[in-house]
Curated annotation (Swiss-Prot):
ATP-binding RNA helicase involved in the biogenesis of 60S ribosomal subunits and is required for the normal formation of 25S and 5.8S rRNAs. InterPro entries: DBP10_C (IPR012541), DDX54/DBP10_DEAD-box_helicase (IPR033517), DEAD/DEAH_box_helicase_dom (IPR011545), DEAD_box_RNA_helicase (IPR050079), Helicase_ATP-bd (IPR014001), Helicase_C-like (IPR001650), P-loop_NTPase (IPR027417), RNA-helicase_DEAD-box_CS (IPR000629). It is an enzyme of class 3 (hydrolase). This is ATP-dependent RNA helicase DBP10. Residues 395-552 form the Helicase C-terminal domain. It catalyses: ATP + H2O = ADP + phosphate + H(+). One of its GO terms (biological process) is maturation of 5.8S rRNA from tricistronic rRNA transcript (SSU-rRNA, 5.8S rRNA, LSU-rRNA). A motif (DEAD box) lies at residues 271-274. Residues 856-868 have a biased composition (Polar residues). Residues 152-323 form the Helicase ATP-binding domain. The gene is DBP10. ATP binds at residues 165-172. Residues 884-903, 922-938 have a biased composition (Basic and acidic residues).
Amino acid sequence: MTMSDIEDSDVENYDIAGKLALRSDDELGSDDEQNTSGEEGEEVELQDEIVSSDDDDDDGDKGKDTGKMPPTKKAKLDRKPGSDFDFASLDFEAEDNEEEDKTLSSILALSNPTAKKAKAGSFASFGFSKFLLANIAKKGYKQPTPIQRRSIPLIIDNRDVVGMARTGSGKTAAFVLPLIEKLKLRSPSGVRAVILSPSRELALQTYKQVKEFSHGTNLQSIVLIGGDSLEEDFGKMMTKPDIIVCTPGRFLHLKVEMQYDLMSVQYIVFDEADRLFEMGFAEQLNELLLALPSNRQSLLFSATLPRSLVEFAKAGLTNPVLVRLDADSKLSENLQMAYFTTKRNEREANLLYILQEVIKMPLGTPEEVKKLAAMDKRSIESDEENEEAKEQNNGKKRKYKFKKERMPSAKELPSEKSTIIFVPTKHHVEYVTSLLKDAGYLVSYIYGTLDQHARKNQLYLFRIGLTKILVVTDVAARGIDIPVLANVINFTLPGSSKIFIHRVGRTARAGNKGWAYSIVNSSELPYLLDLEIFLGKKLLLTSMHEAKCELLKKKQGGSFIPPRINYTERLVVGAIPRLDLETFQELYENLLRNNYEIKVLKDVAAKGEKLYHRTRQPASQESLKRSKEILETNSWDDQHLLFGENLEKMKDDFLAKLQNRNVKETVFELKKKGVKENDSLAEFMHRRRRQLAPIQRKAQERKELLQKERLAGLSHGIEEEVLKIDGEASGYNQNVDEAELQETFELGDEAHNKKKTFKDPQFFMSHYAPASVIQDQQLSIASSFANDAQAATFDLDNDDKLQKNKQQVMKWDKKKGKYINSMSTDKKYIISENGTKIPATFRSGKFDEWRKQRNLKPTSSLTNNETPENNKRFKHKKQSVPKLPDKYRDDYHKQKQKVEKALDSGMRVKGYNKPGMQQELKSTEQIRKARAIKEQRRAKNARPSRRK
């Protein structure tokens, strides 16, 4: 069927979302910045992106369309049965990428004539305007990523979308590009788009992309983040911008403080949606959602979302479509991981060893240290001068322009060994930063409560490559704009598998390879086993690999080749070589001994870690049981396979052979060897050995039996693992076949009420629990975001780690004369528009004071229907009092005429009164003043009144 046949056919109602739902087996794209050019000013031609491939044909074929649309299967916009609020899901059929791109271009050409000549699979095939295509080309983007290719057409078609793709797949551009395409021009009606980001850094990063893609338009966009001046934000909001990029706390504060009307919002985006709904903003988010119009378009994007998204009905989605790209592959295929076991007090030594021996991190040269100190000093001085200028200029900041270093492009590493270290609390940030600086490394640091100016400065130093290491917490690292990294180090293993994905997702982007190193102790082993199930990647201990090699030796004989260790598909666990680790432990102890400040910071971090362990979510019971079994084998802390042969173990094996010799004697027996006389000590040792022999034999048999039971309980043994074909997935993932998909989902456009099966998903109990069920349990969102924050899937811990659930303690209140709950506060609440209680601190009256100082109308008088412009041209009608005439000036008579004219018009001029203008009757204020003056004169003169 040709394109002309399609246009002439009776079937004209093409569902864009339906036709785009084609399953492709291509790998996920890299991050937003993967295709950016090295220079911002580089000119890129648009011809390659817009011109159709038909233009390259021969002249004889021009005007002749010989291509046919590939046969496609209609997409299934499915709904889960048995749910009150159904979410549609895009069912991607297995098709080649080329066919999918051609189909996408053909379908969009039907709805948008500007996309008819667009090259298949390009940004122009979406029907974007010329200015937007030019901005995309300036950024260096050539082809859309999978999440962009599948979600942008749905967004343009005004569908609510829930997008799930891993970190760095281009989610930001997926909602920013259609947003700008739909808004295009400035509108005085008010705010039309709101983008909510969970962190300040992510908001700034999104705002930067909005500004770059909207270049050439008159769209006005602002960014609202915590830490900035409220007065500046008041001024921004009063300009009625088109696009607001903000963090939820500051935006809700301004909304309540200013009583701002949001009924003009057409487009709202929840970036990193899972985190937004788990930050404790339950009441405030409900208030915000109710303040938005019902016909808005809502979009949710995140790297990790559960398969069942019914709970996101709170966000007010209408007939949403789920676009999910990483249901099976949650990590980059280029990411290699290594897990190093540690003892209680050797975590810092492990960190120093990884940096120096594994990553080969260079120490800072004297020139680099001097340059870093100079830039820090310059930043502090400019900040102080900025504060002084702000006080002198009535709150206006003075911008200082310094010569900035060249930022690397998105494809370049900030530095060759750029490494980010994740720690649990802000106390650990200060401790680890001081430790590494004292060891000679160049370090930047960021945590949640750090000043905004300091954040930008620390991130800038890392981006330009002046510092090689960045120490962060999970809260602060969310959304930090670092396109490419070489290494990620987990100082402690996170308590959630989703947090781990967000951490390690910062490396191995844009087709680059990356490493993720994690330091794990025995208490964190259950979380590692949870991660094993969640990722679908099996644990690999050194003993397991050695047993595998022995089995292969028996099978292959002389042709044995040691198997290659796959650090991408397996979780390889082991310890750092003992002798080397002891050297770095001595180095750490010397640093601690010579620097009192580090010792103090270590004590503070230790207290914070105790509270962190007390409040983090527990591991699953199954993982706790398995961790005990692994710890009993005493093989989980063998030397890591990354370091080759274990010389210490070879020495121990040799000593064990000596210990298992046939003739065993003690020193008492050796002395009396060859002497026929009976010796009491030698006889005693013989008798003792005969008594212990049965006990030792039973203990050995018990150990072997436990080992057999453990191996029998595994899903597959070492033999099965060896016989596997190389490259085959060795995890717990189970591919869902087509029959199960058709049974689970329904067509989105049809309202089917009949059940597909007799099973009730709420009560049916299967005879087995597949691994996908465990994965969904870890990905699931609790029934209530507000009430079950503890059980939420992805709960990032605060930097200072305040305890969430403290026991209620009663204390005596002297003023009230009774015992009160120590947890109770006198926080005042106000009733919002929908009747919910919100903190009264949100309504402090600062905006009213700011407005009165500037003589501005209240926001209630600037509603959408009563805008100041009102689409009319204003005429200047203000009349001012003329200047008083001066005899000694040339314009005396002219000014006198102006005064007379003003008096005739009824205006009052000081010193000039016409008949009838002066008020004859005195006011009460004039009478009071006259009496006061009279009393003063009488007291001054002190003379009695004259009597006649």
